[in-house]
Amino acid sequence: MLKIGSHVGMSGKEAFFGSAKEAHSYDANTFMVYTGAPQNTRRKDISDLRLEEGFEFMKQHGISDIVIHAPYIINLGNSVNLDTYSLAVDFLAKEMERTKAFRSKYLVLHPGAHVGAGVDAGIKQIVQGLNEVLTRDTDLYIALETMAGKGSEIGRNFEELARIYDGVKYNDRLRVCFDTCHTNDAGYDVVNDFDGVIEQFDKLIGKEQIAVFHINDSKNDRGASKDRHENIGFGTLGFDAISYIVHHSDFIEVPKILETPYVSLPNEKEKSLPPYRYEIEMLRNSVFDPQILEKIQNNR
């Protein structure tokens, strides 16, 4: 069965219970959430997040295999500022514990950035950090995200991810989150030759290592290294290419998570609406609706 959902929020009094309800409102059967704000280390206590109510709601509505995303501030690749690196390692370990509390198997992580020290130094530092947090007994997977190649990001190509795998002692606890926008922006031809791209990935890492897909169109041409997401069917990837990926027989059981932009209202630019219910429906049915953005704006 196709597993498809989106990023959802987690805030206010309903907390995770509200996250599950938001996912259900999009007719999703999976979703992704941050355990707190992605830009900082402030976190509510697990006991305040209404997890059990969320789990019960998920059970009642056929939602499973949720994904946790690590915050952006974790940069394991920083060998220039070791205080930043130490913070990243410590906070990643805490996020792993929170991921288990959310009953998720997958913690998606941006591998890191070398901040000018060079790719080799960045990869060495990432490997060191992962070796500090992963043990024989780790009972979840860290899913390294494919990156667009913006700035000094590590993970802009499969070779860099493979080098991380090669250096990590307990790399059976690693997986990959394949982002369609990022791989396009990094230079891979996921539009015309997705199977060829996967063949490259399979030779270097193994396609069975892909545990999560981030499903996004892109505002950029292939190889732009910019990482700007677009709504499904309105970017340079196009609906047909994305639908092909979503329904690919090799990955039908892998959770597909939408991270596409909210849709702005024409006369109220400060307000925007989530597109996920509409995009999920389009992708489930494999039928593109070119009027979908207008429908989102009119059905608020």
From Swiss-Prot:
Ligand binding (Zn(2+) 3): H182, D227, H229
Keyword terms, alphabetized: DNA damage, DNA repair, Endonuclease, Hydrolase, Metal-binding, Nuclease, Zinc
Positions contributing to Zn(2+) 2 binding: E145, D179, H214, E259
CDD domains: AP2Ec
GO MF term (any one): DNA-(apurinic or apyrimidinic site) endonuclease activity
Cofactor names: Zn(2+)
Pfam families on file: AP_endonuc_2
Cofactor note: Binds 3 Zn(2+) ions.
EC number(s) on file: 3.1.21.2
Catalytic activity: Endonucleolytic cleavage to 5'-phosphooligonucleotide end-products
Class in the EC hierarchy, top level: hydrolase
Binding-site residues for Zn(2+) 1, renumbered to this chain: H69, H110, E145
GO biological process, any: base-excision repair
First and last residue of the signal peptide: none
Described function: Endonuclease IV plays a role in DNA repair. It cleaves phosphodiester bonds at apurinic or apyrimidinic (AP) sites, generating a 3'-hydroxyl group and a 5'-terminal sugar phosphate.
Record family assignment: Belongs to the AP endonuclease 2 family.
Protein name in UniProt: Probable endonuclease 4
Protein species of origin: Lachnoclostridium phytofermentans (strain ATCC 700394 / DSM 18823 / ISDg)
